[in-house]
């Protein structure tokens, strides 16, 4: 169902607040994106250089510190849905990169759950391997940027319904 402009504006304002809160997290890059309903959502990217060693899915201590801080943002916004997407650079083949990207997303998920984030809030955990680069894989810097985990925070059906009623 289409969501009206008034509802979109209410959710947009809410996401601006969430974005500002998430921007305080160490090592997080934050931006506003559109969700599948065309509503504002917040994408938080964590650089895998901070999160993981090359070819590994175990979280580093600095990653745990950042994710513990980020879990507070998620807990403060428990009515939002979450998707966790892992990515790799194009070094190696899909047989390695695809499962590695899934393992990285699962590592982030497990740690967020251990920090008190509710499992019901997390709607999707997936890996996209090297299929969705954000930088040039032919440079070391580009590959570093492509090794990442993204966490999307978006309006749940309940949040949309509340915004529609408030409108």
Describe the function of each predicted region.
Residues 1-20:
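Short, low-complexity, glycine-enriched hydrophobic/amphipathic alpha-helices that associate
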Residues 2, 17, 62-69, 95-99, ...:
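Extracytoplasmic/secreted proteins, especially bacterial periplasmic and envelope-associated proteins
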Residues 14-43:
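Amphipathic, membrane-active segments
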Residues 26, 38-42, 46-48, 55, ...:
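Envelope-exposed proteins and targeting segments
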Residues 27, 33-35, 47-49, 55-57, ...:
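Solvent-exposed coil/turn segments that connect beta secondary-structure elements
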Residues 28-29, 69, 108, 136:
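N-terminal post-signal-peptidase region of extra-cytosolic proteins
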Residues 51-85, 113, 144, 151, ...:
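Periplasmic peptidoglycan-binding/anchoring modules of Gram-negative envelope and division proteins
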Residues 87-162:
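Periplasmic OmpA-like peptidoglycan-binding domain that tethers envelope proteins to the cell wall
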């Amino acid at each position: 169902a289409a969501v009206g402009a008034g509802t979109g504006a209410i959710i947009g304002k809410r996401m601006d607040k969430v974005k500002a809160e998430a921007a305080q997290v160490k090592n997080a890059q934050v931006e506003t994106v559109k969700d599948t309903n065309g509503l504002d959502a917040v994408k938080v990217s964590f650089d895998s250089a901070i999160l993981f060693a090359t070819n590994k899915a175990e979280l580093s201590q600095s990653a745990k510190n950042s994710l513990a801080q980020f879990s507070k943002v998620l807990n403060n916004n428990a009515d939002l849905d979450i998707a966790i997407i892992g990515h790799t650079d194009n070094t190696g083949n899909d047989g390695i990169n695809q499962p590695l990207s899934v393992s990285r997303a699962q590592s982030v998920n497990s740690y967020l759950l251990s920090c008190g984030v509710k499992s019901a809030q997390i709607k999707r955990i997936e890996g996209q391997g090297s299929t969705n680069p954000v930088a040039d894989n032919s440079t070391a810097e580009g590959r570093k940027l492509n090794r990442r985990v993204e966490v999307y925070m978006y309006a749940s059906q309940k949040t949309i319904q509340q915004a529609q009623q408030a409108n």
